[in-house]
Regions:
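Conserved phosphate-interacting/catalytic interface
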Residues: 1-198, 204
Length: 204
């Protein structure tokens, strides 16, 4: 009875948006990358809310969005599904005060992060005929991290984007992570992973 009551409460709160559904999390998202089905980057849109600060001043903060749950990173590259920071989505980042050796090391790490992101999305979306899935895969396949900073759309917000801001994809007027078909793909993958690692509450 207690577990049923807790489950009902959880589902009610999730439906109201007061907590994230299982397999999803609320994350700070700063930019949206609009892409077409061929994977071309069409525009970069800032996603900031204006909030009141101290002494009557206002400031801009990233929007909070419900996206596929963030992975736990320890060492190595581990990408998030349909959102992440510039190292994973664009394969590039910026850091002040680096010498040449440090910069080269970071660039190599960024490339590995991007490759991890591309591999994750291919493993999840390969063979699917959904337009949004094709758009994301085409973007990741044709994007060249080495030329990211030369892209005029990225350059508009280079300082903010490349300093660790999180971003999502937009396709055909909507956020890709909100696409019902891709959300279903994530739900199934998350449920399968949970089944593989889950424990019984009674037996452990």
């Amino acid at each position: 009875m207690i577990l049923q009551a807790l489950t009902s409460l959880y589902e009610a709160l999730a439906q109201k948006g007061e907590i994230s559904k299982e397999g999803w999390s609320r994350e700070k998202i700063s930019f949206a990358l609009s892409i077409d089905e061929e994977g071309n980057l069409l525009r970069v849109t800032p996603l900031f809310d204006t909030v009141d600060g101290p002494k009557g001043k206002t400031r801009e903060v990233p929007q909070k969005m419900t996206v596929p749950a963030a992975v736990k990173r320890t060492s190595g590259a581990a990408a998030n599904f349909l959102w992440d920071n510039s190292s994973y989505i664009l394969g590039v980042s910026l850091k002040k005060g680096e010498d040449d050796a440090e910069r080269e090391k970071r660039r190599n790490k960024d490339i590995k992060c991007f490759e991890a992101c591309r591999e994750l999305h291919h493993s999840m979306l390969d063979g699917m005929e959904y337009p949004a899935a094709k758009a994301v895969l085409n973007f990741l396949d044709k994007w060249e991290p080495q030329k990211a900073e030369e892209n005029n759309l990225v350059a508009q917000y280079a300082k903010e984007i490349l300093s660790g801001a999180n971003m999502v994809f937009r396709f055909n007027g909507g956020y890709v992570h909100d696409d019902p078909q891709l959300a279903s793909v994530w739900q199934k993958a998350n449920a399968k992973q949970k089944d593989n690692i889950g424990q019984c509450l009674v037996t452990g």
